[in-house]
Amino acid sequence: MNLIASVYIKDNKVVKVKSGDFRTLKFYHESPIDLIKRFEDLGVKDIYFVDLGSAKMYEKNNFILLEMLSQFSSIKINYSGGLRTSEKVSSAFINGADKVTLGSMPVYDKNIFLNCLTTWGFKKIVMAVDIWKNSLRINGWKHQTKIDPLDHIDYFSNKGLKNIKVTDISKDGTLDGPPFSLYKKILKKYPQMNMITGGGIRNIKDIEKLKDIGIKNVIFGRAFYEENITLNELENYLKK
């Protein structure tokens, strides 16, 4: 089981929102670098860096902070938010991202997304499958499509896609528990996929249950920031 720390950034601070709603935005840390160092000391190997301003507000990508985080830590960074062109994807990698997660691009321009897969490699590109009421949402979860998530995965799976990040938006940042049945359904249909799951984690028991159903990559965030998962619990779990 690979535990991935969720680090949402707005105005160079660590924040979290519930189900993508900016009205619920809550600040947690003034210094992203100090937080990353803390995760590194605990044994976390990967972070999911969400550039929230770029994703939802069309602000300039915070590549300066991305570069700083990559220089001050050995943690691998999966960067997401506002990467709507191949040039921005390239800039993310140049500035220290180990992976990038793309959600809007595969919907708006399949050919550019497929070109990203072949240019940077299938291991470095993750497709976001962000679900609200059984359909995809894109553009920082602001635009509801009529696209069926499984049809979306089908198309790119047939093109060689290896990595997906699946989020039930209604669960994200809520501490309401993960959508276990959704994950089981996708695991069963796409056993070859490397699936990253995120949203709803309440405690260590949720993480253990996800492992039991076959999930290998779990993003956690609010449960740690709100101390539902303690430092000792996280450190002990990472040592297993």
Where are these regions (language model features)?
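Glycine-rich, proline-tolerant flexible connector loops at the mouths of alpha/beta enzymes
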Residues: 46-64, 104, 165-176
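Glycine-rich phosphate-binding active-site loops on the catalytic face of alpha/beta enzymes
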Residues: 91-112, 168-171, 199-203, 213-233
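Hydrophobic faces of well-ordered beta-strands that scaffold small-molecule active sites
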Residues: 3-9, 47-49, 77-81, 100-102, ...
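Glycine/small-residue-rich loop that forms an oxyanion/phosphate-binding "nest" at active or ligand-binding sites
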Residues: 53, 61-118
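Short, acidic/polar
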Residues: 28-40, 85-90, 144-155, 207
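Catalytic cores of alpha/beta
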Residues: 73, 77-99, 182-217
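Conserved anion-binding
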Residues: 10-24, 90, 97-172
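Charged helix-capping and loop-helix junction motifs
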Residues: 60-67, 142-151, 176-184
